[in-house]
Swiss-Prot record:
Keywords: ATP-binding, Ligase, Nucleotide-binding. It is an enzyme of class 6 (ligase). ATP binds at residues 98-100, 107, 242-243, 298. This is Elongation factor P--(R)-beta-lysine ligase. It comes from Photobacterium profundum (strain SS9). It catalyses: D-beta-lysine + L-lysyl-[protein] + ATP = N(6)-((3R)-3,6-diaminohexanoyl)-L-lysyl-[protein] + AMP + diphosphate + H(+). Its EC number is 6.3.2.-. Coiled coil: none annotated. GO terms for cellular component: cytosol. Transmembrane segments: none annotated. Substrate binds at residues 74-76, 116, 249. Pfam families: tRNA-synt_2.
């Protein structure tokens, strides 16, 4: 029986984890993508209503009253500042922090792989990510489907044109009436249906890329110029697990600022505290952000799947409950 001080991952599994990380670095070195290192804390943070941050106070010289700092939920904002400064293609493997659940697929502190490719759109980046997944997971080429196709295929309703009542009707067939019937926000309802009725059905044999999410869920992605109902965003699923979230990145600083402000208005309407907007990012976008695509991938989940394990604690030395 293991003792409380011991790692939850075996030494063998930690060595296998190290080998996967080494293969990822070799993959990017072969493509001349530069590894970078950015801060784990920032004076600003994400405004996304679905993300919850850790924060602390810096009380060093000049900050007698304390400076609030936020642990980064991803390295995205700092990496985009590097891109605007002319870095070219970059990647990072780092710790990220989200003040949310812990469990089979979640730990508040986790390892993220994030990379950006100037002159790529989201389809180009899906191609490259498919290469990486085949390397690490030893799987066949991924399948691809639009968000609309996935909804119609698995739930029989169009997420872009279906009425709220039609969406709630589908939720009732899934046994989700108690949650869905009082819901007034369309995106919340769509996310509920996707998580409960689509995610666990796609990508069972090979990874599945789902692209062109509703424009209302664009976040930091561009709107599709030929169909303004959808955003140039994708997610990746395998064995019912979300692995990654990628964008054809929004380059317009003014539009990004509006989206952040809209997020904060939504946070207030939901009884959540508005978050400080990263104005350094906004100015970096305004200064000249390259046309590019970027993606964030959960390393712990990826390695768990690569090793055919069923809990991220098996590939993490010290999860939150024994950290």
């Amino acid at each position: 029986m293991s003792q409380p001080w011991q790692p939850t991952a075996s030494i063998k599994q930690l060595k296998q984890r190290a080998a996967v990380l080494s293969s990822i670095r070799d993959f990017f070195a072969g493509k001349e993508v530069i590894e970078v290192d950015t801060p784990a804390m920032s004076q600003a943070t994400v405004t996304d209503v679905h993300l919850h941050t850790f924060q602390t106070e810096f009380v060093g010289p000049g900050y007698a009253g304390g400076q609030t700092l936020y642990m980064m939920t991803s390295p995205e904002f700092h990496m985009k500042r590097l891109l605007s400064a002319g870095s070219g293609p970059i990647y990072q493997i780092c710790k990220s922090f989200r003040n949310e659940e812990s469990g089979r697929y979640h730990n508040p502190e986790f390892t993220m792989l994030e990379w950006y490719r100037p002159d790529f759109d989201h389809h180009d980046l899906m191609n490259e990510m498919d290469e990486l997944l085949q390397l690490v997971l030893q799987c066949d080429k991924a399948e691809r489907m639009s968000y609309q196709q996935a909804f119609i295929q698995e739930l029989g309703v169009c997420p872009l044109e279906g009425t709220m009542e039609q969406l709630k009707g589908v939720a009732r067939t899934l046994g989700l009436a108690d949650i869905a019937d009082p819901e007034q926000d369309r995106d919340t309802l769509l996310q509920l249906l996707f998580s409960m009725g689509v995610e666990n059905k796609i990508g069972q044999q090979v990874p599945a890329f789902v692209y062109d999410f509703p424009a209302s869920q664009a976040a930091l992605a561009q709107i599709n110029p030929t169909d303004n109902r959808v955003a140039e965003r994708f997610e990746v699923y395998f064995k019912g697990i979300e692995l990654a979230n990628g964008f054809h990145e929004l380059a317009n600083g003014d539009e990004q600022l509006v989206r952040f402000e809209q997020d904060n208005m939504k946070r207030i309407s939901m009884g959540l505290k508005p978050q400080p907007i990263d104005l350094h990012l906004i100015e970096a976008l305004r200064a000249g952000f390259p046309d590019c695509a970027g993606v964030a991938l959960g390393i712990d989940r990826l390695i768990m799947l690569a090793l055919k394990l069923d809990h991220i604690d098996q590939v993490t030395a010290f999860p939150i409950d024994i950290a």
